[in-house]
Curated annotation (Swiss-Prot):
Family from the record: Belongs to the PPR family. PCMP-E subfamily.
Keyword entries, A-Z: Repeat
NCBIfam families reported for this sequence: PPR (TIGR00756)
Gene that encodes the chain: PCMP-E12
Signal peptide feature range: none
Species name: Arabidopsis thaliana (Mouse-ear cress)
InterPro entries (alphabetical): E_motif, Pentatricopeptide_rpt, PPR_At4g14850-like_plant, TPR-like_helical_dom_sf
Name of the protein in question: Pentatricopeptide repeat-containing protein At4g16470
Amino acid sequence: MKTLISSSLSHKSQCLTICFKLNKLAMVYYTREFQTEASQTSASGSMFSGNATTILRRMLAEKRIGRFQVENQRKTEKLDKTLKGLCVTGRLKEAVGLLWSSGLQVEPETYAVLLQECKQRKEYTKGKRIHAQMFVVGFALNEYLKVKLLILYALSGDLQTAGILFRSLKIRDLIPWNAMISGYVQKGLEQEGLFIYYDMRQNRIVPDQYTFASVFRACSALDRLEHGKRAHAVMIKRCIKSNIIVDSALVDMYFKCSSFSDGHRVFDQLSTRNVITWTSLISGYGYHGKVSEVLKCFEKMKEEGCRPNPVTFLVVLTACNHGGLVDKGWEHFYSMKRDYGIEPEGQHYAAMVDTLGRAGRLQEAYEFVMKSPCKEHPPVWGSLLGACRIHGNVKLLELAATKFLELDPTNGGNYVVFANGYASCGLREAASKVRRKMENAGVKKDPGYSQIELQGEVHRFMKDDTSHRLSEKIYKKVHEMTSFFMDIDYYPDGLDSSCPV
């Protein structure tokens, strides 16, 4: 081989041929030998031999790169199959871990399968990890995967990231619009959800049944009857096919907006009635304290052969509570397991405790709690605590409050209920101690808010809130009214600073 190289260097026209031969051999040893021999001959000063060496090195490098790419391609194909297999067998955690440890990009279809699995299992954190892996390995998102991620972020409540993905879409069809509307409504930002709905309509996107399910829920929460009727009219005009979810949301919307006749008429016109739509009707009457209507509808539901579910029974028990119907409450409570095989849960026990408490049967309520399998359920003790506060039973109040705080020590509302219970019984010092204990524990109560609708716009207010654009004028008016009441020596009930929170 050395002889071949040396003789070849004397013929510059054959240098390129030698390069190809060496490339075919793919041996770094001969490449270095070629350079050494060339430097010792007359060709060492020739630019041609230098170029030949450069070409040779480049060709060898390309060969290595090609081999690396082929190897990587094989790894990726194997990884794709493995990840899909893990998803099919429900091993999502292993799939995400393997994806990260590989440090490789996979096919868009594989990413889509992983994200879909995260969505179905409500493993939103794992979905975000997959998105982070895409970013780390430099994967360029296509429009389909952007929509997949948008839906995942919207479901998880991360509307900021969902909004960024939404705005980055080149084409916004109905699916991303629905995801954004639903995301805002589920997070309790119904007003913003309606804004997006109207923005979608201005962009000439035709809504579907999923759109209206979210819009009707938003109108229910905001008590926006006119907006709900307008959406219902669009649904009828566009001949949008309904489903059980939309039907129940529509019935619920009319009842929540105090339009009983419209709500019942929609229910009567339904082609299919099931436990969900029946429960919406019963719940609608219960929401407004129509106890007799709740019980009538419940009986009619059973007559038509529709079996109630735990939610239906909870609505009925709550109605019995509001109506002070203790015996009826017991009847339906025992009927759950006896007639329908439904095991009462914590909320059902809490409803019965509340019913007994309203009737002043506190000792019976306490004994019922102690015998129940849900005595470790905080709302059960919360119901007893509320009843003790109303009837001024300090002994049971302290017992219920102690257990309540023990089960849920981080809930600021529990401390407030306890303190208010002491205050209602005239024990101001004890109430102050509870508030100090709450402060020392670093526990805060989530602020409540009030809202009103003026000229089609909903305005929300919280304590010490200055975020409203007319805050200065609002507070000025409040001070004027306060001064006026003081001038005429009028003090509303509960204005004393030591009153319950």
